């Protein structure tokens, strides 16, 4: 599975980048906790490389983690480890690329890559079904990021 979804946020790039690179802020806008029913907690300070969001089911069993792996002014990268089809380990990659559209507008691209850990044939079917849901959640993530950042007070005023 591989795709890119994009949105324009009516805020300067540093504000948008901060909302993505700070895992505490990310949890305020992410669509995933509600969609999965998992409890999410930040492990580490939430801003340093290696910090992670840990996803636990209702029994408290870890189902996955999203680790902050790179932060630049125009890019934030997360690497995930989670249970995929049949409980097999998946290692998706989510990169956020940012580009200024104007001084107060930022285009955000969410790049997603993952391979279901299944044999060919079965993998294609699983990725088709799983991919639809995951992609819809990525679109919702971007919409929620936009709402979160645009509702925040403008810095410096």
PLM regions and their residue ranges:
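Beta-strand/loop substructures that line and gate deep hydrophobic ligand-binding cavities in soluble
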Residues: 80-140, 145-147, 156-157
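Hydrophobic ligand-binding cavity/cleft-lining segments
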Residues: 1-45
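Glycine-rich portal/gate segments that line the openings of hydrophobic small-molecule binding cavities
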Residues: 27-28, 38-87, 107, 140-157
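Short, intrinsically disordered, mixed-charge
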Residues: 18-32, 73, 127, 131, ...
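Hydrophobic/aromatic beta-strand elements that line small-molecule binding cavities or substrate pockets
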Residues: 5-7, 64-70, 92-100
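Broad hydrophobic/π-residue packing in well-ordered secondary structure
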Residues: 17-30, 65-66, 80, 96-98, ...
């Amino acid at each position: 599975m591989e795709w890119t979804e994009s949105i324009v946020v009516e805020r300067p790039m540093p504000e948008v980048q901060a909302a993505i690179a700070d895992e505490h802020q990310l949890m305020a806008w992410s669509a995933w906790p509600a969609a999965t029913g998992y409890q999410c907690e930040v492990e580490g300070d939430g801003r340093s490389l290696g910090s992670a969001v840990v996803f636990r089911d209702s029994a408290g069993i870890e189902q996955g983690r999203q680790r902050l792996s790179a932060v630049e002014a125009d890019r934030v990268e997360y690497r995930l480890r989670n249970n995929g089809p049949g409980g097999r380990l998946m290692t998706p990659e989510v990169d956020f690329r940012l580009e200024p559209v104007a001084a107060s507008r930022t285009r955000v691209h969410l790049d997603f890559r993952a391979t279901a850990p299944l044999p060919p044939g079965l993998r294609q079917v699983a990725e088709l079904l799983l991919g639809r849901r995951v992609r819809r959640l990525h679109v919702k993530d971007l919409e929620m990021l936009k709402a979160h950042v645009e509702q925040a007070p403008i810095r410096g005023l």
